[in-house]
Amino acid sequence: MKNIAIIGLSSFGYYLCEALNEHGFNLMAIDLKPDLVNQVKPFVRKAVIGDARDKNFLMQLGISDFDTVIISV
């Protein structure tokens, strides 16, 4: 199954996590706001609070190993 990272968990990002989880994708969600990250935890394999504008942060998460990265800002 594909590994997908979703950056930005506003309404669109939240619903992406929910829908893609229903289809069995392996998901990682990233946002700066802890409350948004906590809301998607039931739908994702990994939920991370952090600044996705920071290249080093993304590299530490292994972003290059994902099949798809969706930016929802």
Regions picked out by a protein language model, each given a short descriptive name:
Residues M1-V73:
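Cytosolic regulatory regions of ion transport systems
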